[in-house]
């Protein structure tokens, strides 16, 4: 699979006049699939970040027992999830992202997303036979975003 290359540019700003939710409300109407991940650990001042992820570029989704890799909305590859091949396919798809960035921010550049409760069937020897809801979402979706705003709540 051909690598998809990215170069990260960072800027630091003081964020004491805005909240993650306030920023999210501003961006969600302009950019589809904006994601807010808030820190819920207020006891420790270490690594207490919230992330606002804007404009997904690369998507990895598990739907209808298929794992697909998309770039800017176009499916590049899709393979069936069978015989416990999830980890192999996921590693293959994540390996397609070639990132050039400063080592100090490498931990912030990556995939953000979710795994649903029913997604456990891809990690364990469990086969679920629940009926899909008409408004079902992918069982697993992780995206590499064009913009990631990391808000450090204590610095």
Predicted region positions:
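Signature of the chorismate-utilizing enzyme
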Residues: 1-155
């Amino acid at each position: 699979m051909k690598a998809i290359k990215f170069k990260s540019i960072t800027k630091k700003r003081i964020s004491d006049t805005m909240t993650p939710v306030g920023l999210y409300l501003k961006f969600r109407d302009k950019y589809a699939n904006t994601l807010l991940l808030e820190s819920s650990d207020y006891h420790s001042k270490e690594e207490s970040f919230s992330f606002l992820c804007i404009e997904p570029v690369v998507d990895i989704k598990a739907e209808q027992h298929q794992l697909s890799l998309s770039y800017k909305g176009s499916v590049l590859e899709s393979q069936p999830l069978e015989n416990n091949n999830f980890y192999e396919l996921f590693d293959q798809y994540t390996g397609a992202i070639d990132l050039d960035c400063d080592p100090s921010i490498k931990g912030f550049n990556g995939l953000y997303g979710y795994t649903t409760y029913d997604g456990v069937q891809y990690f364990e020897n469990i086969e679920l036979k629940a009926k899909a809801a008409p408004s079902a979402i992918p069982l697993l979706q992780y995206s590499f975003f064009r913009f990631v705003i990391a808000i450090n709540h204590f610095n």
